[in-house]
Amino acid sequence: MPGGLYYPGGDSSRGTTALAIECIDQQSIDVSVLAIAAELRHFGDLAQQVIRQTERRVIAGEKLPPAEKIVSIFEPHTDIIVKDNRDTFFGHKICLTGGGSNLILDCLIVQGNPADSTLPQTMLDRQRQIYGRYPLKAALDGGFASKDNLQDAKTSGVKDVCFAKKRGLKVADMCRSDYVYKRLRRFRAGIESGISWLKRSFGLWRCAWKGFASFKSYVWSSIVAANLLTLSRRSTPT
């Protein structure tokens, strides 16, 4: 390469980009140009990571864990979300907690793609941190169901725990009666309709803001807007 520079292990495009950035760093004193160089360096590093992961997966046949994959050079924080054997999504898992008031009481935004079964106790603990106690009743999605999660919830003081899918659990172990279990299951269905409302009316189906911090801000702004509308409807005379 010109000037005797050599970039081992890299193709010509990577070497050319690195050389251009080096020349800018050495010769430019213009702040705007240096900012462009920093941006080039950022995307150049991400591009090299994409090339390396492609070489490992496609050429070497190596299976990479999701945490090591870059699926977007513009939003590198994006996680690969796999729901059972269904569709694959890109973004972040969001766990919402709602109450009888129809308000969203809490939101847990998770990085990575942890199994749903690892999340319930964290959500319950957050309720205790916010309100000073654990809820007396809890209705959760079927993906959260496990004997350990049921035991942890009961130990925390939750009297009735309803998982939408039993997954081998007995109603008698979860709730005091079939009646309570059915009531909680219907309540959880109402939470699902609230989530659909957030997606349809408040843009929660897709985030258009850049960066993980902005992603969290976008999610919370949608939730706050929905809660404010719910409160205003309750306070409006009919």
Predicted feature locations:
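Short acidic (Asp/Glu) and glycine-rich catalytic loops that position anionic groups and cofactors
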Residues: 72, 98-105, 132-133, 168-177, ...
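Hydrophobic alpha-helix feature that most strongly marks membrane-spanning transmembrane helices
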Residues: 101, 109, 125-132, 143-144, ...
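Basic, amphipathic alpha-helical segments enriched in Lys/Arg and hydrophobic/aromatic residues
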Residues: 40, 44-45, 54, 179-238
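An internal, acidic/charged active-site-proximal segment
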Residues: 32-33, 131-186
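Short C-terminal domain-edge/linker segments immediately following a structured domain
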Residues: 126-127, 137-139, 168-172, 192-194, ...
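Polybasic low-complexity intrinsically disordered regions
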Residues: 1-136, 140-142, 150-152
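Short, low-complexity, polar/charged sequence segments that are solvent-exposed and flexible
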Residues: 90-93, 113-116, 125-127, 157-158, ...
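Generic structural "secondary-structure junction" signal
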Residues: 72-75, 92, 106, 146, ...
